[in-house]
């Protein structure tokens, strides 16, 4: 567990409310009965979070609970409103994948006021009561990315950051800075591209104008890395080494093609699955695991076969 992952443990119990399922996926069988869980995802425009949702849906089906999924489309205010709506719909637990860790505080407060247990997945919440936090060790992942980039090249590199307020972006950046000590690379520019491929392309294009001699790029996720690769053109994987984060299918394909030297693979389906498992336990008043760490691994051409689906 790294120091930036803060979990405020509360003995939260779900209020007995009539269930209304607005939309989403549900399962039958198991021991879930009429229990409904709400899942608030930051964005389903990112393949990584689509996989997280799929893992959550699979777990819900196996446990026999209903899962209602909403997409904030990377709008923190919208996400707070969605969670507040959940509290009026009779859900027995809420899972949140925060758009912004700080701006998620009102969502956490809404869940607390409604006496509904809250589980954070993939990203933490800076302030608020959380029954369980399910996430990768992003500090470790960022450090591994720096080490791998340092093995692949030397000289000046740039860092494409995610959403500034997201804990995953902060933690990966912290780990990347720590890992720089082990290699011969130096960060000459860092700029947010909000975990978005199109923004990654635009930001990378602009950065290249002032830093044309760079030798490497670390992007906080594969989507931004793929945008950077497009901006680099034929230089990607030859003159400029790119390291991503997530291990998405498109990211793995870039590793296979040689345009991305490595990606730090997460397990989004496992994250989604474990988040639902903890949410169901919390809804039933059972003991939950306060922090659930999901392993990350560096993927290169050498071990790519282990991760291809």
Annotate the PLM regions:
Residues 2-13, 17, 23-309:
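A residue-level marker of the well-folded mature domains of exported/periplasmic proteins
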């Amino acid at each position: 567990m790294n120091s930036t992952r803060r979990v405020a443990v509360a003995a939260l119990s779900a209020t007995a409310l009539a269930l209304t399922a607005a939309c989403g996926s549900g399962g039958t069988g198991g021991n879930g009965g009429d229990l409904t869980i709400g899942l608030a995802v930051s964005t389903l425009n990112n393949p990584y979070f689509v996989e997280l949702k799929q893992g959550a849906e699979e777990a819900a089906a196996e446990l026999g609970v209903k899962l209602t999924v909403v997409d904030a489309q990377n709008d923190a205010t919208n996400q707070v409103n969605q969670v507040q709506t959940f509290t009026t719909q009779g859900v027995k637990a809420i899972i949140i994948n925060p758009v912004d860790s700080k701006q998620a505080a009102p969502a956490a407060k809404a869940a607390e006021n409604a006496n509904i247990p809250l589980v954070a997945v993939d990203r933490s919440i800076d302030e608020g009561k959380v029954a369980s936090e399910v996430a990768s060790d992003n500090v470790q992942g960022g450090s591994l990315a720096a080490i791998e980039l340092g093995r692949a090249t030397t000289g000046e590199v740039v860092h494409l950051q995610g959403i500034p307020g997201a804990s995953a972006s902060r933690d990966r950046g912290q780990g990347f800075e720590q890992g720089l000590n082990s290699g011969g690379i130096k960060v000459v520019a860092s700029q947010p591209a909000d975990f978005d491929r199109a923004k990654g392309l635009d930001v990378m294009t602009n950065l290249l104008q002032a830093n044309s001699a760079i030798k490497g790029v670390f992007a906080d996720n594969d989507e931004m890395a793929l945008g950077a690769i497009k901006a680099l053109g034929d230089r990607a994987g030859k003159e400029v080494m790119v390291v991503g984060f997530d291990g998405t299918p498109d990211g793995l394909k870039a590793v296979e093609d040689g345009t991305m030297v490595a990606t730090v693979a997460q397990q989004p389906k496992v994250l989604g699955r474990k988040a639902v498992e903890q949410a169901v336990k919390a809804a039933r008043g059972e003991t939950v695991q306060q922090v659930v760490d999901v392993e990350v691994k560096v993927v290169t051409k050498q071990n790519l076969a282990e991760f291809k689906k």
